């Protein structure tokens, strides 16, 4: 079982302040001050208010919602004058409601852009975040900025918090963990990618992306091991 990130409560209280004291999201050599990075969870009073903010800015959802409201009002008007709820009215309401639900579902789907996913993997490889590490806040900020600047999201608030970004990363590398093979003589493991795994998994993925997947998965495996070692130091979990 993978541990969850601990919530960071040291973010700045002023959402209008500059989110960074120094550094640039596009320059990994100039580190960001994670304590001063402002994420949506620091700006919004609740997740519900954040979600409402995002949905309102999705024009296609709002257009369909307004059309649905107009349909409801028109149907109620027809019922008021005719006193009859006809099958056509029911179908009209169901179609309008289905369109709204479909648009909200598409809004909540994970972004599948390969460049975005590769950048996230490279951010993890660059920052080598630990479990519950402050590096995840920096990574989340960088990814939010990238999605906004690349036009893949309408606001710079795609990930509500670092926990959400971390969960997305875990889903991305799920099934991509390198096999850990144990040297029984030295009780030390070493990580390798079996030939059959490399041949069968992600055969349609570019070699660079494939390397990023396995490298990021290796870093995650190390982070998980270090986390549990810190929680149970007397168990003697072997180093990877």
From Swiss-Prot:
It is found in: Membrane. InterPro entries: DUP/COS (IPR001142). Changing residue 67 to F: In strain: CLIB 382, CLIB 556 and CLIB 630. Disruption phenotype: Cells lacking all 10 proteins of the DUP240 multigene family show no obvious alterations in mating, sporulation and cell growth. It comes from the Eukaryota. Changing residue 18 to I: In strain: CLIB 219, CLIB 410 and CLIB 413. GO terms for cellular component: membrane. Changing residue 70 to L: In strain: CLIB 382, CLIB 556 and CLIB 630. Changing residue 81 to L: In strain: CLIB 219, CLIB 382, CLIB 413, CLIB 556 and CLIB 630. It is a multi-pass membrane protein. Residues 1-29 are annotated as: Disordered. Keywords: Membrane, Transmembrane, Transmembrane helix. The keyword Cell inner membrane does not apply. The chain crosses the membrane at residues 61-81, 84-104. Has been shown to be a pseudogene in S288c, CLIB 95, CLIB 388, R12, YIIc12 and YIIc17, due to a naturally occurring frameshift at position 8 in these strains. The sequence shown is from strain Sigma 1278B, the closest phylogenetic relative of S288c. Belongs to the DUP/COS family. This is DUP240 protein DFP1. It comes from Saccharomyces cerevisiae.
């Amino acid at each position: 079982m993978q541990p969850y990130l601990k919530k960071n409560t040291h973010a700045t209280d002023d959402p209008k302040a500059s989110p960074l004291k120094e550094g640039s999201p596009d320059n990994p050599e100039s580190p960001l001050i994670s304590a001063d990075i402002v994420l949506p969870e620091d700006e919004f009073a609740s997740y519900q208010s954040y979600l409402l903010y995002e949905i309102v800015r999705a024009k296609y959802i709002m257009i369909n919602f307004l059309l649905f409201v107009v349909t409801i009002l028109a149907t109620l008007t027809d019922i008021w004058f005719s006193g009859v709820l006809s099958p056509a009215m029911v179908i009209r309401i169901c179609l309008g409601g289905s369109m709204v639900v479909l648009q909200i579902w598409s809004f909540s789907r994970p972004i599948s852009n390969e460049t975005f996913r590769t950048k996230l993997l490279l951010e993890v490889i660059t920052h080598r975040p630990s479990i519950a590490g402050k590096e995840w806040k920096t990574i989340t900020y960088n990814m939010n900025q990238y999605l906004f600047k690349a036009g893949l999201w309408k606001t710079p608030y795609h990930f509500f918090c670092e926990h959400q970004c971390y969960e997305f990363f875990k889903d991305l590398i799920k099934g991509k963990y390198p096999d850990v093979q144990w040297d029984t003589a030295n009780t030390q493991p070493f990580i390798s990618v079996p030939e059959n795994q490399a041949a069968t998994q992600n055969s349609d993925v570019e070699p660079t992306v494939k390397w990023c997947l396995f490298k990021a998965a290796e870093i995650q495996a190390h982070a998980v091991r270090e986390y549990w070692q810190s929680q149970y130091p007397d168990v003697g979990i072997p180093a990877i």
